[in-house]
Design a protein with these regions (language model features):
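Short linear motifs in intrinsically disordered
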Residues: 27-34, 75-78, 141
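A generic structural signal for alpha-helix starts
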Residues: 73-74, 109
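Short, intrinsically disordered, mixed-charge
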Residues: 80-85, 116, 120
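Short histidine-centered beta-strand/loop micro-motifs
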Residues: 68-69, 77-80, 141-143, 162-163
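An N-terminal domain-cap segment
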Residues: 11-56
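Charged, gly/pro-rich active-site loop segments
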Residues: 1-19, 94-174
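Short beta-strand segments
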Residues: 37-71, 77-79, 85-89, 96-101
Length: 174
């Protein structure tokens, strides 16, 4: 991993990736209270090259972000055509942007595991019997009907801002 301290000129130390990963591991699901709730934001590339940013219920599991969407949604069409994307999240005192490629997940064991992770975090997802996707009694209205495709975003790089002492701004290349 390459570590680039973007806050060096201001005398800030580099952010510790292990600490960031630990926060993501313990807190990537939204909290039920307003003080600790958070949203993850997915940025994809439109056909004309412009960015498309939308909120998603992404989870951090096994060192990567996972999200789901309907095949006919703009984000679904965008990642099918061009997998480059980023996911941004604020986890307590840390802002994280992960950049990578969205890879559609179709392996039944992986779908079952991520569906269980979503269910364990309050969204009753389960693998869909009709094919390589997931289903649930509800989803965001813009997702369209189930089944929904699941994507994994393997980090290629990350930018992390630490908002509490000692502060920090660091880019990581994996």
């Amino acid at each position: 991993m390459e570590i680039i301290n973007l806050g060096k000129a201001e005398g800030l130390p580099p952010v510790d990736w292990a600490a960031v990963a630990g926060k993501l591991d313990s807190g990537s699901a939204p909290a039920p209270d307003g003080a600790n709730s958070r949203t993850t934001w997915l940025s994809t590339v439109n056909e004309d090259g412009s960015p498309h940013v939308t909120a998603v219920g992404a989870l951090w599991l096994d060192g990567t972000f996972w999200f789901q969407t309907g095949a006919g949604t703009r984000k679904g069409r965008n990642v099918a055509r061009d997998p480059r994307c980023s996911i941004a999240a604020s986890i307590r005192d840390t802002d994280v942007v992960i950049e990578g490629d969205a890879t559609r997940v179709t392996e039944p064991g992986a779908l079952a595991r991520i569906a269980k992770a979503w269910a364990d975090n309050g969204w009753p997802a389960q693998p869909d019997d009709s094919g390589p996707g997931i289903t649930a009694p509800f989803n965001a209205p813009s997702q369209g009907p189930p089944p929904w495709n699941v994507y994994r975003v393997e980090p290629r790089s990350a930018i992390v801002t630490l908002g509490t002492e000692p502060g920090g701004l660091t880019r990581f290349r994996f």
